[in-house]
């Protein structure tokens, strides 16, 4: 919910949400999630592109039309694609988990430009992404307390799955 407003997941399809080992939504739930997004398709018989509700076979919709639009909306920074981020970053899940919880006020003597935030786990301690998590930000259906720690765990678990959606199945072979 929170990350998808800026970050893409271009290697994940909506159908993956209903597969074993992942979030395991029902097929109907995954269809409803897909249909809540507009997808550009085409061309039609007249050679024109058109918009339609998403379907299970579609990849996750990108939050921006292109790199320049993403940079313009994010102070010049391009939010990385999240679908394989835990595999691309040194430290993987542990790094992202720590990064999500590493926001602090900068130490005395450190000044930051507008739109730059201090994060004790980011290389150089400066990051363009503001802290996205706060206690109570989301509501869990099972009543789980939505702490920053819990949401960080859930985000990184989900991102590990997106990077290796069939890992569990391969391990059972």
Regions found by a protein language model. Give the residues of each.
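Extended, hydrophilic extramembrane loops/domains of integral membrane proteins
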Residues: 123, 127-164
């Amino acid at each position: 919910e929170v990350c998808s407003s800026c970050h893409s997941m271009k290697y994940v399809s909506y159908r993956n949400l209903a597969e074993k080992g992942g979030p395991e939504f029902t097929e109907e739930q995954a269809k409803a999630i897909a249909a809540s997004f507009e997808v550009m398709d085409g061309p039609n018989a007249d050679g024109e592109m058109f918009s339609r509700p998403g379907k299970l076979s579609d990849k996750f919709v990108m939050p921006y039309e292109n790199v320049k639009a993403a940079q313009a909306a994010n102070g010049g920074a391009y939010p990385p694609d999240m679908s394989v981020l835990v595999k691309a970053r040194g430290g993987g899940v542990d790094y992202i988990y720590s990064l999500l919880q590493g926001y602090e006020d900068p130490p005395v003597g450190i000044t930051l430009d507008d739109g730059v935030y201090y994060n004790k786990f980011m290389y150089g301690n400066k990051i363009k992404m503001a802290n996205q998590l706060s206690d109570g930000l989301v509501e869990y259906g099972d009543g789980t307390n939505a702490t920053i720690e819990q949401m960080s765990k859930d985000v990184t678990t989900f991102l590990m799955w997106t990077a290796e959606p069939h890992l569990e199945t391969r391990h059972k072979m």
